[in-house]
Amino acid sequence: MRRSRFTLAVTALFLLPAAIPAALAQVSDSSSNPMQTVVVTAQHLNQERSQIQTQVGASTYTIDSAAIDAAPGGDNVLMNQVMLQIPDAAQDSFGQLHIRGDHNGLQFRLNGIILPDGISVFGQTLPPRLIESMQMVMGSLPAQYGLRSAGIIDLTTKSGSLDPGGTVTLYGGSHGELEPSFDYGGSSGPYTYFVTGDFLRNDLGIESPDGSSDPLHDHTKQHHGFAYAEDVLDENDRVSAIVGLSDADFQIPDLRGEQPALGLTVNGQSSYPSEFLNENQREVTQFGILSLQHSNGPLTVQTSVLVRNSTLGFIPDPIGDLLYNGIAQNAFKQDVAYGIQSDGAYKLNDEHTLRTGVYFQYDTLHSDIDSAVLATDPFTGLPVNGMPISIVQDSDNSQIIESGYVQDEWHLLKVLTMNYGLRYDHYNAFSSGSQLSPRVNFVYQPFTDTTVHLGYSRYFSPPPFELVGSEALSQFANTTAAPAVLKDDPVKAERSNYYDLGVEQNISKHLTVGFDSYFKQATDLVDEGQFGAPIILTPFNYAHGQVYGFEWTGSYHEGGLTAYANLASQRAIGKDIVSSQFNFDAEELAYIADHYIHLDHEQQITASGGLSYLWKGTRFSSDFLLGSGLRSDLNLPDGENIPNGAHLPYYTQVNLGIEHDFEHQGLSGLTARIDMINLLDKIYEIRNGTGVGVGAPQYGPRRGLFFGVTQAF
């Protein structure tokens, strides 16, 4: 019933743009709005909407749809693969990536509107096909950005008015991959629309746990859908609606040749080959956004209502999980978020542009967990018998987030701009807190081709509510799942001071280079780990944290040649775990209480780059990743273990692509592509199964050959 009500709500939300003009009767008349007028008005409103937000003083990187299409794989890859080409983006297992030493500090926005966090771990909610352009805003962020501090991914969606038509694509190849997809956009009178969808299946849904190209039990089926519709009411107003869906099923991959090591017996069975384990996880996300934009002279305002439903279900192997882990946990979580966001900009004069906004979000979190465990003797700790018992934990919780900001973009001199403001955030969930955060950024352009930025931001980042657990530890006393540590302090919001200094230099009209540096000092630094069989990340706090680093970037554009390169170095450390302690060993907690350790997602050296060349209808492309490796535990000769004290070996991955447009062969709209992923077939570890909050070993993808055919119409 929950899901049915939500689906009806999203459907109604999608239909609203069509109903509004009828209700307003005379507001919009397609006979008096020629197509060209609508297109020009849409372009004007897009430009005005972009003025609501400012990136003054922040580090901003832009990837447009042409750049995505030009890379190996094009828009057939998942979103995380596109984002790995952002400076200082370190890849991790489960499709995660970490920007500037932050575990999960990313906030997605669609046309400037916040998309609340979801529960999904492996699944990618947003397909790259919806992107007209993607802005990654990092560093010292202006006051309109909050709640997440590592980076803002603001996606400008395709609309259909500026580039009508569509495509149908069939893509597939290695690892049993097959992915049909489509997109279509157009206009009719004052209405414009864009839709896209795909169905992905392959046998490498999650990273291989043993480095093989054919991991056991690793099939995935995924559906992604997205739709955008807008109604231009008049030259100053428009209503737009967005709906999206991601539905993904994953098999949890198995290791080969393993046997249970706990010495347990379940219903008379004590052996269980790891090849026979059968764990599965399903992740579903649905969202809808309805927006009204008004632009008149110096004033532009956009107000939106939004809803997001996210569910995750894990089905264990009932016997195998008990034998290997001492617990078989059937878990279901659902988080529904409702929100209101309103942002406005007013150009007071040539020197001052004022911006202000508010954001409200209400979440409900429902959790059903049924854990099968074995009872143990309270004195010996040994199982009483081999008969599983069930522990049921159902819970309902809620969260409220309230935010507001005001800021002024002040052009002090022709070559100097200051953006300063205040932001207030308050949240109330498993814990509560609030903060008034000052922000100030400067941009100095001493020469036409030189831009320097300097900024300070105070950040307040609540823990991801949808991931916070609510286990009652006492229920697991005298069972095979009893934690060694019984302390479970609530996760708190991270508070930090952030400093950023950078420079960008246009060497020529074709070549641009940049340098950026940053330093973050945090209290109650939020990190996440994967504990137990359900692949659900759990947040926890380090009492103290520091993150700092440097970035070098370069890009070159001339004719049909485009090239870029990024190099980053970072250090991310934390001390004293002060929440969710029951997930850790007592020895681990004791060491971290007295020592700063590297965060498990720190990668000290990260590099990426790519190039593409268009020649007579054929595009040749290549990109690469290089990393010094994420952290792992260090085992000393005397037997002492240092959490996250080592890092995995350096790795590189090189990808190639060739795409040809058959226009000159008389086949209008037909293109074909060949992509080679991991050209050199490098076998490299992303995780080795050790480290704070690290789950199973996982490896990067082995060499894969993929083919695609696209017909435009």
Language-model regions, residue ranges each:
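N-terminal periplasmic accessory domains that precede
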Residues: M79-V82, L97, V121-F122, M136, ...
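Short acidic/polar hinge/loop motifs at secondary-structure boundaries
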Residues: I113-G139
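Transmembrane beta-barrel wall of Gram-negative outer-membrane proteins
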Residues: G172-R201, S212-P253, N280-T300, L348-N349
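Extracytoplasmic beta-strand/coil segments of soluble accessory domains associated
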Residues: M79-L115, E132
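Gram-negative outer-membrane beta-barrel transporters
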Residues: L413, V513-Q521, F540-L636
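N-terminal periplasmic "start-of-domain" segments of outer-membrane beta-barrel proteins
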Residues: T37-G73, N104-Q107, M134
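Conserved C-terminal beta-signal and adjacent last beta-strands/turns
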Residues: T11, G185, E230-D234, Y596-F713
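Membrane-embedded beta-barrel scaffold of Gram-negative outer-membrane proteins
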Residues: S295-P316, Q445, L467, D489-G559, ...
